[in-house]
C-alpha cells in the first residue's frame, strides 16, 4: 500500500495541508481528518476487531470494525471502502453516516495522541473476511446489544473512540436501527 497521509485541519475543520500518517501521530498530534466504521453482517451482528500488536497507537485493543484516514481528494465513504478492503479483505454496502460530527482527542498509554474530526459510518459486509494480520490480530461477530453492554460495563477494554461513539445516544440509536434492518 502506498504511503498514507492525514489531512490536517484548523479549529473550524477546514483543511490546511497534509502530513505523512506515522509522522502525524505523536505526543503532539495536530487536528486531522479520520473516519470510523461499524460493519454488520447479514445477521445484524457487529464486527469487533482487535488491533494488531504492531499498531503504533492502542495496539491489541478491541475496537469497532475499521478506522482510518481519507486521502486528499478522497471522500470519507471511499476511504471506508478502501480501508475495509485493505484491513479486512471485505466488500461492503455503501457506508451510511451515523455520527457525522464526531470529534475526539485521546492519549494512548505510550503517549501517542489521537486528535481527530472523525465521522462515523455503518455498512454491511457483502463478502467473506480475509484479515490482514498487520492490521487486525483477532475479530469476533457479536450482537450489538452485548457489545454496548460490554462498553458500558468495561470501557477500559475498548478503544476510547469506540467508547465515546457508543456514549452518544443518537449514534447508539442509529447503530441499533442499522443492526436490526437486515
UniProtKB/Swiss-Prot annotation:
CDD domains in the record: NUDIX_IPP_Isomerase
What cofactors does this protein use? Mg(2+); Mn(2+)
Which reaction equation describes what this protein catalyses? isopentenyl diphosphate = dimethylallyl diphosphate
Question: Where is this protein localized, as stated in its record?
Answer: Cytoplasm
Span of domain Nudix hydrolase: 30-164
Task: Please provide the record's keywords in A-Z order.
Answer: Cytoplasm, Isomerase, Isoprene biosynthesis, Magnesium, Manganese, Metal-binding
How does the record describe its quaternary structure? Homodimer.
What does this chain do? Catalyzes the 1,3-allylic rearrangement of the homoallylic substrate isopentenyl (IPP) to its highly electrophilic allylic isomer, dimethylallyl diphosphate (DMAPP).
Tell me which HAMAP family the record gives.
Idi (MF_00202)
Please state what the protein is called.
Isopentenyl-diphosphate Delta-isomerase
Annotated source species: Escherichia coli O9:H4 (strain HS)
Species lineage: Bacteria, Pseudomonadati, Pseudomonadota, Gammaproteobacteria, Enterobacterales
